[in-house]
Amino acid sequence: AAPGSAAPFSTLRPGYELCRNCHADMVDATLAKGRVHWAVADKKGCVNCHGPHAAKHDKLLTKAGAESCRDCHADTMARIAAAPVKHKPVDSGACSACHSPHAANGVHLIDQPSINTLCESCHDYQTHSAHPIGDKAVDPRNKNLRVGCLSCHTAHGGDFKWMLHSATNIELCTRCHKQFAR
């Protein structure tokens, strides 16, 4: 567009293709992952979060830390803000402690083989749990599911101590083990 015109800014190449000219290794590694964040893959590509030439924040981010995430994930951020108990990385605005902002091979853009593995990268399962989890721990509600960290805990924050789904152990256990309900 001509200087001073109302026409939108345009580039020689769309989205991440423009960035690939100089950052081919990073763009190619990102696109090779199993799950690519929509913000990378859409028509604006990298400039959804990064300034093309300069920005006030590290890594040319147009907004600091979690503020970049808030633009598109406002509903999640609102739930987190309302939760009385928050996961420490979430409370500090460090979304990238668990989620990759660009792409990952794991669900929910986590770069771990499973949610349990992600949790165990900071939390010692043997110290923090009395319940088995993993491939051998079958969910009593559905034989096709396995018990994992999120069976009892919320990921970002919640209403109860230790981010549990229920206020008491009895309530928590009887969510799956109905035979123990009073």
Task: Name each model feature, range by range.
Residues 1-182:
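Short sequence/structural segments immediately N-terminal
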